[in-house]
Amino acid sequence: MCELYSKRDTLGLRKKHIGPSCKVFFASDPIKIVRAQRQYMFDENGEQYLDCINNVAHVGHCHPGVVKAALKQMELLNTNSRFLHDNIVEYAKRLSATLPEKLSVCYFTNSGSEANDLALRLARQFRGHQDVITLDHAYHGHLSSLIEISPYKFQKGKDVKKEFVHVAPTPDTYRGKYREDHADSASAYADEVKKIIEDAHNSGRKIAAFIAESMQSCGGQIIPPAGYFQKVAEYVHGAGGVFIADEVQVGFGRVGKHFWSFQMYGEDFVPDIVTMGKPMGNGHPVACVVTTKEIAEAFSSSGMEYFNTYGGNPVSCAVGLAVLDIIENEDLQGNAKRVGNYLTELLKKQKAKHTLIGDIRGIGLFIGIDLVKDHLKRTPATAEAQHIIYKMKEKRVLLSADGPHRNVLKIKPPMCFTEEDAKFMVDQLDRILTVLEEAMGTKTESVTSENTPCKTKMLKEAHIELLRDSTTDSKENPSRKRNGMCTDTHSLLSKRLKT
């Protein structure tokens, strides 16, 4: 493949012309990706990387069915949605068929951020209320209206929480306020929302909506306890608000057993508004808000027309329809269940073996590995997590870390991920954890390595990295980027680009 620029020149041009707040993976040595296919990505040297984090290329990178559908429609027509066209109504019909009956009205947008912004508008118009309840560590998009309700973002900056925003504790039963040993963590976390509603009402405020990802992604791959959402919905509805389920990162069969993540909590839980995005177009910008007729009619009654220039255009809908076809025809939802179960079992064995692994949580191909320094205190192993993802990159496996402490390895690969891919990923992780734990002086079970000299070399390198970091001159800039371990998680690691 002919490239316009060398990697060095590409980096230079990026620094010159792209805003510095636009980050890339692996800051100290970014990968230049030139092509991709299925669950694999290739750099400018032809090196193949196993993609374990790209939940945008849902049915696989550059799937020929998606490419063909886009090309065919682009050759015929692509215009705005003010004209009648079959694609938009067919796509709306197909999407609605995957959802509970009451969710039947669609608004197409171009991104998850646009979808969540519109969801807030729908919720506020419905009853005329303004306040929003969100979860701690939540992220719902990059628009100003969404940064305001995303503690993941506004708590990191200088922004002050707006008075109409109320933050409820994340229903995290591993690291949160109410843990796995609590008698009824679902009720306890839901009661926190109930108290927020009561306090808001006592202050003369009214709740428009509660918004949450069906499984919190950026917050650390958190799966709420069973019954939590039902109780929250009851309290929110009682306050005249609506429940918004953000499925932007977790929908379209990723959990395996169900097409939508919110469905795994039971048939007695149905959100009032569902937003979706990322995987819808397999990389093509398409997103959607689906809601009830009642909420849609209230929005229309405002007299303000809703129009989105590109939302629901013929090409985007053709791509979206192709993605739905591929999920069904290739049984990718079933694959997510089978491979996800297999991967989870492999990781549970690693948890029993490695002291750094505190928790394995997930369902289908949505999995988090919570790394800790101390199992009793559950101290986040932030530096170790960053070290691991860089070492995995050297092994040609792409992982990333997230959560409030950046210590949770997140796994959200394309849905065509195989058992062979899962085993390869876990084998590399096992070797890296073994070397790292030995370098740290923590106990790990004995591991038979296929390449003892290589293991010895890695162990020496890990020792050197740890030594170098612990003896860094205090006068040096502690936030400089480095391709390895660090001792100051609030300086170096916080400066590292989000991966």
UniProtKB/Swiss-Prot annotation:
Subcellular locations according to the entry: Mitochondrion
Catalytic activity, EC: 4.2.3.2
Residues bearing the modification N6-(pyridoxal phosphate)lysine: 278
UniProt-annotated stretches for the region Disordered: 468-499
InterPro entries from the UniProt entry: Aminotrans_3 (IPR005814), Aminotrans_3_PPA_site (IPR049704), PyrdxlP-dep_Trfase (IPR015424), PyrdxlP-dep_Trfase_major (IPR015421), PyrdxlP-dep_Trfase_small (IPR015422)
Needed co-factor(s): pyridoxal 5'-phosphate
GO molecular function terms noted in the UniProt entry: ethanolamine-phosphate phospho-lyase activity; pyridoxal phosphate binding; transaminase activity
GO cellular component term, pick one: membrane
Major localization class: mitochondrion
Keyword Lyase attached: yes
Function comment: Catalyzes the pyridoxal-phosphate-dependent breakdown of phosphoethanolamine, converting it to ammonia, inorganic phosphate and acetaldehyde.
Similarity comment text for this entry: Belongs to the class-III pyridoxal-phosphate-dependent aminotransferase family.
Subunit structure and binding partners: Homotetramer.
Protein name: Ethanolamine-phosphate phospho-lyase
